[in-house]
């Protein structure tokens, strides 16, 4: 948590070959220059090993943000809209052909391992806006993962309370920024679909997928509001950390009122995740049959289940604080049911049968810990494993307490699930404001371009990114005859 998105890549494109601007002649050239920087940064990010991509993420975000004002300026000129009170006259000379590599579409999956998925061609600047903004939103989500990563690392000492709150606040801000972008794109895509009947080229930028990603970002941001003051995951991680030097632990303490509030927040996150899952699951039944990958659908379902399990845990904490240990254990049974954990009927707890079952569980935990240490696709189960560890700790504590002191009857969990209240929202989604060029920059682009646009000279495929230069002493046009067969020969 959050979802480990993969950033797309794109082909080279020259704005000057498809657009001309009478009012600001240098606008197409500047847009091509900014887009070329974005293309190179995305290509460099993709080729960097996964464990080292974090260092290049701020560069990708900054290049995307720098490119957006020029892209929106060209888009405004095509639709005859003013920017800062200044008219921009952009003329379409020929339909653009831009290639993007989708990362969420199920048809992007390839049968050959190690081969990149196929690209899709877009013939409208509108979908260029969609891909660039969705890429920026995905990058914001990856920045949220980067901020939360130190909270789950076990190879160093646990972070303090203040550092934990700072990390959660930074991640929440990035997720809310991503949700605002997704909401803007979803509204714009719905207008294209209903008003002009335009079908998206892939599922990544379809109205349903964009709305689902907005709901996903809101669900993850809502869960972070709970994680900020939830002491139990930190206690479980601290107990598993071998580098922890604390010899005295403070028992987790949650006020009764806040436990009920946290439960309703988790239910709100579960509702967002359920909406996202429903939208993505319905894509395959829509016209065209475009659908998202199974891994993304599985993550949405796990997030919905984990959020409901968290709500059951907080309802159980609320009951335990009120002296109703039997009801608290019943809430744990309901949460285990939501997590899909098998229960032993004789003991009522999570099934801990020895042999291969326990060995497989330990192997899964070690594999997830290695993913966290290396910074790979950790949290791909939407926090299900982490929540099951908290459940195990609470089950041992409450069952021992009920067997020795309280001796209360554990009621069935079915009626408790039917009495769960509605979720409560905590975040307000702010509308996304498209960035605009400032007046001095617009005024400077009234001058004619000082150079030609060389974006078309670069190959369109990011696999063949090495240009064949002229060999010294060779005749013009015979560069390929002197080319070595080694791909990366220097």
From Swiss-Prot:
GO biological process, one term: cellular response to pH
Database matches in InterPro entries: BRO1_dom, BRO1_sf, pH-resp_palC
CDD domains referenced in this protein's UniProt entry, alphabetically: BRO1_UmRIM23-like
Occurrences of domain BRO1 (ranges): 1-299
Full protein name: pH-response regulator protein palC
Region entry Disordered, spans: 342-362, 445-470
Function text: Required for the proteolytic cleavage of the transcription factor pacc-1 in response to alkaline ambient pH.
Gene Ontology CC entries for this record: plasma membrane
Lineage: Eukaryota, Fungi, Dikarya, Ascomycota, Pezizomycotina
Family membership noted in the UniProt record: Belongs to the palC family.
Gene designation per UniProt: palc-1
């Amino acid at each position: 948590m959050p979802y480990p998105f993969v950033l797309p890549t794109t082909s080279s494109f020259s704005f000057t070959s498809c657009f001309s601007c009478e009012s600001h002649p240098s606008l197409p050239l500047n847009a091509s220059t900014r887009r070329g920087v974005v293309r190179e940064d995305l290509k460099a990010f993709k080729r960097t090993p996964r464990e080292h991509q974090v260092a290049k993420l701020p560069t990708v975000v900054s290049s995307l943000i720098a490119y957006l004002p020029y892209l929106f300026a060209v888009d405004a000129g095509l639709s005859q809209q003013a920017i800062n009170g200044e008219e921009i006259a952009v003329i379409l000379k020929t339909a653009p052909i831009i290639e993007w590599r989708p990362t969420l579409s199920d048809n992007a999956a390839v049968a050959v391992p190690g081969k990149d998925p196929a690209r899709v061609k877009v013939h409208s600047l509108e979908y260029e806006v969609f891909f660039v903004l969705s890429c920026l939103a995905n990058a914001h989500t990856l920045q949220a993962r980067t901020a939360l990563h130190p909270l789950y690392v076990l190879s160093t000492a646990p972070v303090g309370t203040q550092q934990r709150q700072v990390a959660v606040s930074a991640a929440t801000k990035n997720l809310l920024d991503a949700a605002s972008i997704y909401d803007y794109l979803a509204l714009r895509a719905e207008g294209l679909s209903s008003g002009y009947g335009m079908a998206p080229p892939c599922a990544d930028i379809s109205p349903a997928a964009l709305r689902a990603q907005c709901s996903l970002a809101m669900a993850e941001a809502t869960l972070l509001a709970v994680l900020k003051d939830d002491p139990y995951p930190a206690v479980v991680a601290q107990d598993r950390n071998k580098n922890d030097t604390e010899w005295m632990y403070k028992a987790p303490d949650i006020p009764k009122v806040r436990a009920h509030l946290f439960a309703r927040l988790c239910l709100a996150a579960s509702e967002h995740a359920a909406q996202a899952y429903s939208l993505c699951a319905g894509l395959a039944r829509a016209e065209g049959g475009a659908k998202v990958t199974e891994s993304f659908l599985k993550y949405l379902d796990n997030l919905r289940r984990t959020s409901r399990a968290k709500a059951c845990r907080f309802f159980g904490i609320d009951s335990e604080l009120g002296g109703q240990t039997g009801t608290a254990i019943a809430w744990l049974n309901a949460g285990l049911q939501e997590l899909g954990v098998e229960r032993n009927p004789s003991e009522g707890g999570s099934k801990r049968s020895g042999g291969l079952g326990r060995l497989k569980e330990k192997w899964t935990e070690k594999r997830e810990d290695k993913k966290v240490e290396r910074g790979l696709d950790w949290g791909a189960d939407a926090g299900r494993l982490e929540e099951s560890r908290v459940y195990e700790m609470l089950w041992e504590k409450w069952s021992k307490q009920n067997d020795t002191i309280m001796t209360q009857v554990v009621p069935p969990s079915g009626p408790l699930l039917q009495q769960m209240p509605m979720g409560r929202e905590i975040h307000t989604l702010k509308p996304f404001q498209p960035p605009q060029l400032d007046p001095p920059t617009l005024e400077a682009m009234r001058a004619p371009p000082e150079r030609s646009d060389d974006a078309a000279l670069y190959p369109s495929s990011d696999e063949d990114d090495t240009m064949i230069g002229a060999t010294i002493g060779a005749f013009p046009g015979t560069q390929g005859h002197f080319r070595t067969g080694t791909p990366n020969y220097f």
